[in-house]
């Protein structure tokens, strides 16, 4: 009798790459050099997450045949690459704004909690052979983490150029999560 629970070679390749990307993102965020600026700290901790999203999308595009999921991944990858460029361009201005010590502590505490929850949820997605389902379930907590961190940063004074980037991230990532959940629901796949 055949074991129907075995992971396919395609799923194994996808998952191995996924976990490498997740581990690299966690290391990149952890290694970010923090300063006395919430704006700076948000940017240097967000860039590894945006780069990871691009790699997650490319990983899916290597194996997916689902046109709708592929188009979503292509859009997300393009937007995330643009976000990295915009954040890197804003970094010099962000460095000019020094944040009060209390604000720094409060922001960083919340950002760390959000990141830990995101990593846990991304790592806890049940493994399976439907890589499109895996991708959507893995990317939803990534989007939620980005949205929550952007909302948190907006509670404090940030550089003038960063504020519109944060509002855009909240809007875009909220829409993307809605689209991903709708894709899962339309196909009869559960979101968790």
Indicate residue ranges for each PLM-predicted region.
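All-alpha RGS (Regulator of G-protein Signaling) helical domain and cognate RGS-like helical scaffolds
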Residues: 1-192
């Amino acid at each position: 009798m055949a074991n129907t629970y075995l992971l396919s070679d395609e799923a194994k390749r996808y998952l191995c790459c996924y976990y490498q990307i997740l581990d690299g993102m966690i290391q990149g965020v952890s290694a970010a050099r923090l300063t006395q600026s919430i704006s700076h700290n948000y940017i240097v901790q967000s860039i590894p997450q945006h780069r990871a999203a691009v790699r997650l999308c490319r990983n899916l595009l290597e194996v997916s045949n689902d046109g709708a999921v592929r188009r979503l991944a292509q859009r997300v990858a393009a937007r995330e690459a643009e976000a990295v460029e915009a954040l890197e361009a804003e970094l010099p201005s962000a460095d000019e704004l020094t944040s009060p010590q209390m604000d720094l502590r409060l922001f960083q505490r919340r950002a760390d909690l959000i990141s830990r929850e995101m990593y846990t949820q991304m790592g806890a997605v049940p493994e399976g052979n439907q890589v499109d389902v895996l991708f959507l379930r893995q990317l939803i907590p990534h989007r939620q983490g980005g949205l929550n961190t952007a909302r948190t940063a907006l509670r404090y004074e940030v550089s003038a150029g960063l504020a519109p980037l944060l509002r855009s991230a909240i809007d875009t990532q909220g829409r993307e999560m809605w689209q991903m959940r709708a894709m899962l629901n339309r196909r009869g796949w559960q979101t968790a």
